[in-house]
Structures are given as structure tokens and as C-alpha cells.
From Swiss-Prot:
Coiled coil: none annotated. The keyword Transport applies. Involved in translocation of long-chain fatty acids across the outer membrane. It is a receptor for the bacteriophage T2. FadL may form a specific channel. It is a multi-pass membrane protein. GO terms for molecular function: ligand-gated channel activity; long-chain fatty acid transporting porin activity. Keywords: Cell outer membrane, Lipid transport, Membrane, Signal, Transmembrane, Transmembrane beta strand, Transport. The gene is fadL. It comes from the Bacteria. Has been isolated from outer membrane preparation as a homodimer. Belongs to the OmpP1/FadL family. GO terms for cellular component: cell outer membrane. The keyword Membrane applies. Residues 1-25 form the signal peptide. This is Long-chain fatty acid transport protein.
Length: 446
């Protein structure tokens, strides 16, 4: 695995933390910004205004609130992602539960200024990913540890033009932190085999090099990359109210440009750099810098909410993410030399969701939803550190209102991912995944 390949995987992982659902929505986006939304598979989020969390999706919904409103909570993600396969060396590539559990917190506040204007703020984690393999895992050169976290700070405002039309605009500041580690696994054995099968294997020097490669311990850290950075963008929304029971929304989230500076190191001896081997560039434990610019894709969403009966409502969404903007990754050194330039060729992807809400009485509200997440990652670009796949959602939830001011939301979703094949480096894998998500939020109107 060359430094080009290593940097590509690391950069893509950083991109994942910022633009998209492996923390459980296809394309690596995190949808988990509220527990009420979780209970309806995030259907109709741009048009529903049942708590302050919806405003982080569509700022135009601020005009639906007549009192300052607060919401805070978290979603617990319990994934079950398993990898299987056999290395060319004969070692097993089986790894269970490679994605650890995680908490995704959220906090929202909305405040009307008058009948026409209002503002809101939120703290969410819109993107994230974590996969962990044992340090001695045979495929450690493409597995290892991938740990990515983000925090999104949003400030937005809204204007009501008349009884039908409202408009909202928001500013987003995204903080991202990434840590990537890769280990030798059985890569040394595979490299030694390649050398011995080549003309170099007939020479004393080549045989000595093969012996050295074959002696690399599985837990040797062949690459380490970490970094953090801020990125900025904006979002906007339009809300059309046909009447008090029927409303529709169009929302937009802009591209975000992220300029990363990361620290790269490898424990391999620098002597390996002289032979053009398929391993990361060796630094002998020293650290060097790498720079990466990512233009993260925009997202559009159309939503609707229809209260078809005093006790029943249906809601739906269609989201479209312009992943085709993500065509390549390019990293450079401090001197400006290209460290890698790799064609990614992502395709645009969509998410469709449908749900229903039952207003039982003044205290109890029940909701359900289903959704389908289309993966933007072409089969040839899948990775075990980012084992993306199409996903299906089944969701249910409830809200209990203590009084007219305070309420609590509870939501649960089950996600099922398709079984997929992954070809990465010299390895062939099969991956299957599913997840349970549990969320709760407390809401208060002042």
C-alpha cells in the first residue's frame, strides 16, 4: 500500500466525518439531530414543527413558534458491522463489531422576535464515523482505527412574508477531528512474496529485503494521521403553508470547503522507501505534514406534512445529495508536491422517507416511519474502514407532554444494511451491517 493509497483512505475518512451517514445513514451523513425525528425515520423534517430540533433542518420553521423553545437530548447508536474473508497469505480476515457504540448529542433553541421575525441556534453532530480493528488484524494496512468526530454550530433567522410563505437562512461552523491508524498485519508477508516472485527475488539484495519485510510484526504502526479544522457553510429553507393542516418545504445546505493540515508518521524504517514497495512511505517514527482541501457536496430536500384527520398526519421527504461533486482527492506536502491524486467517481444519492403521526390526546403523541438511504459509494471504491451500503430504516417513537410547556420525546430506529463485497488492496472482503438507534429529548417552551 503506497503513501498515495494511505493518504487517500485517510483523507476520505476525514471527508466522511464532515459530509455525510456511516454513523448510520448512507453517504456517511448523521441524521440524528432529534429524537422525535428518529421516531419517524426523519420524514417530513423540513415541514414539521413539533419541537425546536426541526429548525436545524429548515430555518424557515422558526416562524411556526410563538414562544421561546428549547430542546436537548442525545441518540445512542448501537451498530453491528461484521467483516469476513481470507487473506492471500491464508490468514482469516474475520472481524466482528468493527463499529463501536456512540452517543450523538443535540441542543436547540428557537425564539420569536415578533410576528414576522425570529431566530434560532443549534449544536449538533452532522457527520461522524468510527471503525476499530485489532492491532494484529491481518488486513491492518487497510483497517486499523478510523475515529472521526464533528460538531456543527448553527445560527439562523427567519422572516414570515404572509400567512403562507416563510423564509429562513442559517450559518454553519463545522469543527472536525480525525485520527487514522494503520498497522502492518500480514502486508509484510505479502510484500515478501511479491519480491521473491519478481526478478529481484533472484538476487542477494532482493532476498535480504524479502526477509526483512517478512519479519515485520503484525502490530507495527505503518501509518498514523491526525488533524482538526474548521469549515464554514450556509443553509436556507422555504416554508409554504397551504393552510394550518398542510405545509410543504424546500431546504438547501451548501457545499463546505475544508482545508485540512494533518500530521503523518510511520514506524517503518526509511530504508523501505528506496525500493518502491506497496507500503506507506516510511518515516522512521518522524512526523511530517500533509495538506488536503475538500469541497463537500451540497444537499437539497423536499418535505411535506398533511394533517389528514384531527388525530392523524402523514409526512414525507426526498433528499438529494450532489455526491458527484466528490470526484477526486488530492493531498500535497509542505513543498507543494502531490502526495496523491485519486479518482473517486462518487455518484449522486438520494434518501426517501415516509411516516405518520397519531395525536392520541393532549398528553400522548405516537409516530412511525420508514426510509431508504441510497449509498453514493461505487462498489469499486468501498473500504472496510468506510463500509458504506444501501440502508433501510424502520422507526417508532412517542412524545409525552407533562403540560403545555414541558414534554419528552423517545424514538427508536432499526437499520438494516445490505451485504456487500469489498475489494481493497490485495484483499477481498464481505461486509454486513445493521444498527439500533435509541434517542430521547427534553423540550421546554418558556
Amino acid at each position: 500500500m503506497s503513501q498515495k493509497t494511505l493518504f487517500t483512505k485517510s483523507a476520505l475518512a476525514v471527508a466522511v466525518a464532515l459530509i455525510s451517514t456511516q454513523a448510520w445513514s448512507a453517504g456517511f451523513q448523521l441524521n440524528e439531530f432529534s429524537s422525535s425525528g428518529l421516531g419517524r425515520a426523519y420524514s417530513g423534517e423540513g415541514a414539521i414543527a413539533d419541537d425546536a430540533g426541526n429548525v436545524s433542518r429548515n430555518p424557515a420553521l422558526i416562524t411556526m413558534f410563538d414562544r421561546p423553545t428549547f430542546s436537548a437530548g442525545a441518540v445512542y447508536i448501537d451498530p453491528d458491522v461484521n467483516i469476513s474473508g481470507t487473506s492471500p497469505s491464508g490468514r482469516s480476515l474475520k472481524a466482528d463489531n468493527i463499529a463501536p457504540t456512540a452517543w450523538v448529542p443535540n441542543m436547540h433553541f428557537v425564539a420569536p422576535i415578533n410576528d414576522q421575525f425570529g431566530w434560532g441556534a443549534s449544536i449538533t453532530s452532522n457527520y461522524g464515523l468510527a471503525t476499530e480493528f485489532n492491532d494484529t488484524y491481518a488486513g491492518g494496512s487497510v483497517g486499523g482505527t478510523t475515529d472521526l468526530e464533528t460538531m456543527n454550530l448553527n445560527l439562523s433567522g427567519a422572516y414570515r412574508l404572509n400567512n403562507a410563505w416563510s423564509f429562513g437562512l442559517g450559518f454553519n461552523a463545522v469543527y472536525a477531528r480525525a485520527k487514522i491508524e494503520r498497522f502492518a498485519g500480514d502486508l509484510g508477508q505479502l510484500v515478501a512474496g511479491q519480491i521473491m516472485q519478481s526478478p529481484a527475488g533472484q538476487t542477494q539484495q532482493g532476498q535480504a529485503l524479502a526477509a526483512t519485510a517478512n519479519g515485520i510484526d503484525s502490530n507495527t504502526k505503518i501509518a498514523h494521521l491526525n488533524g482538526n479544522q474548521w469549515g464554514f457553510g450556509w443553509n436556507a429553507g422555504i416554508l409554504y403553508e397551504l393552510d394550518k393542516n398542510n405545509r410543504y418545504a424546500l431546504t438547501y445546505r451548501s457545499e463546505v470547503k475544508i482545508d485540512f493540515k494533518g500530521n503523518y508518521s510511520s514506524d517503518l524504517n526509511r530504508a523501505f522507501n528506496n525500493y518502491g514497495l506497496p507500503i506507506p512511505t516510511a518515516t522512521g517514527g518522524a512526523t511530517q505534514s500533509g495538506y488536503l482541501t475538500l469541497n463537500l457536496p451540497e444537499m437539497w430536500e423536499v418535505s411535506g406534512y398533511n394533517r389528514v384527520d384531527p388525530q392523524w398526519a402523514i409526512h414525507y421527504s426526498l433528499a438529494y445529495t450532489s455526491w458527484s461533486q466528490f470526484q477526486q482527492l488530492k493531498a500535497t506536502s509542505t513543498s507543494g508536491d502531490t502526495l496523491f491524486q485519486k479518482h473517486e467517481g462518487f455518484k449522486d444519492a438520494y434518501r426517501i422517507a415516509l411516516g405518520t403521526t397519531y395525536y392520541y390526546d393532549d398528553n400522548w403523541t405516537f409516530r412511525t416511519g420508514i426510509a431508504f438511504d441510497d449509498s453514493p459509494v461505487p462498489a469499486q471504491n468501498r473500504s472496510i474502514s468506510i463500509p458504506d451500503q444501501d440502508r433501510f430504516w424502520l422507526s417508532a417513537g412517542t412524545t409525552y407532554a407533562f403540560n403545555k410547556d414541558a414534554s419528552v420525546d423517545v424514538g427508536v430506529s432499526y437499520m438494516h444494511g445490505q451485504s456487500v463485497k469489498i475489494n481493497e488492496g490485495p484483499y477481498q472482503f464481505e461486509s454486513e451491517g445493521k444498527a439500533w438507534l435509541f434517542g430521547t429529548n427534553f423540550n421546554y417552551a418558556f
